[in-house]
Structure formats: C-alpha cells, structure tokens
C-alpha cells in the first residue's frame, strides 16, 4: 500500500552553497554566529530582528517583515557547535527551514563555508524559485557577507595594541 503524504509533510530539495572567506576560521565562526538586529542591512533586506535568547550554545531570534500580501514572520533557533559548525531550525508563517553550516580551514589561512538547507513552504502561492535560482540568490548573499566579514577582519587587525 502506498503511503499517503500530506502537503504539510513534504520538503523540497536540499540546497547547497560553498563560499571561501579571506579570514581565519575562528574569526569566521564568531562573525557568522553573532546574530544582530543590524543583519538585515548586510543582506539588503528590510526585516526587523529581535534577539530572544543568546547563550554560548544557542541563539534564538525572530524576524518580521512587511510584504505586499501581509507580514512574514519567522523564529529561528540556532544551535552553536564551536569551533566550526552550527545548526538552525526556523519556523515561520510562510515557510519552515532546517540548515547546517560548516566551516573548514584552508591552507592559506582562509576558511571554506558550506551551507546545506531544506525548506518547506507553507503558502502555495509563495514566491517560487527554482533550485538553481535559490542557490544563486543565497550565494550572492553569502558573498556580500564575506566582503563585510573580510572588511571587519582587516579593520580589527589595524587596531593599535597597547
């Protein structure tokens, strides 16, 4: 007998992106997991972020953004696994998502970033992107993050020591 699946139980494809950061792994981990209300500006987005909880092993935050057809809300629980990985589970009114992030040192002092995620849309007419379009959009965002991170790293290295 074929097992029935509901719309609620379906997940889409697994998405993947890989980016290199011109910073050491410890700096990349600290930078990537330092969730702040200012993160939207790095993405060129307009959502508002509220940090609900922050401990050495977990960050919980909520994002809220107005759209043409109402509010987009999500709550993300990020489990930190220092020194090089973290896991995120997000629930929202339009989609749920699970993601795994892994950093690996590269021989030249740089860091490789690997992101794998799955999302489950909850709204049938939500903006549909192909797998390639979604991965390309995410890659662009992480390249912007990489540029900001590398600038922050250079700035931190120029600070005078006392």
Regions found by a protein language model. Name each.
Residues 3-7, 62-63, 87-89:
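Short, P/G- and charge-enriched loop/turn segments at secondary-structure junctions
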């Amino acid at each position: 007998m074929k097992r029935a699946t509901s719309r609620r139980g379906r997940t889409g494809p697994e998405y993947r992106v890989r980016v290199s950061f011109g910073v050491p792994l410890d700096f990349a981990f600290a930078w990537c997991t330092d969730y702040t209300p200012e993160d939207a500006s790095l993405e060129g987005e307009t959502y508002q972020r509220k940090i609900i909880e922050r401990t050495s092993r977990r960050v919980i935050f909520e994002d809220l953004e107005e759209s043409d057809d109402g509010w987009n809300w999500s709550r993300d629980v990020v489990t930190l696994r220092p020194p090089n990985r973290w896991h995120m589970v997000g629930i929202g009114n339009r989609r749920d998502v699970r993601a795994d992030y892994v950093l690996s040192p590269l021989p030249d002092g740089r860091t490789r970033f690997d992101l794998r995620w799955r999302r489950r849309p909850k709204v049938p007419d939500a903006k549909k992107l192909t797998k390639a379009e979604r991965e390309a959009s995410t890659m662009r965002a992480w390249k912007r993050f990489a540029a900001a991170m590398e600038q922050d790293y250079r700035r931190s290295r120029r600070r005078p020591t006392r």
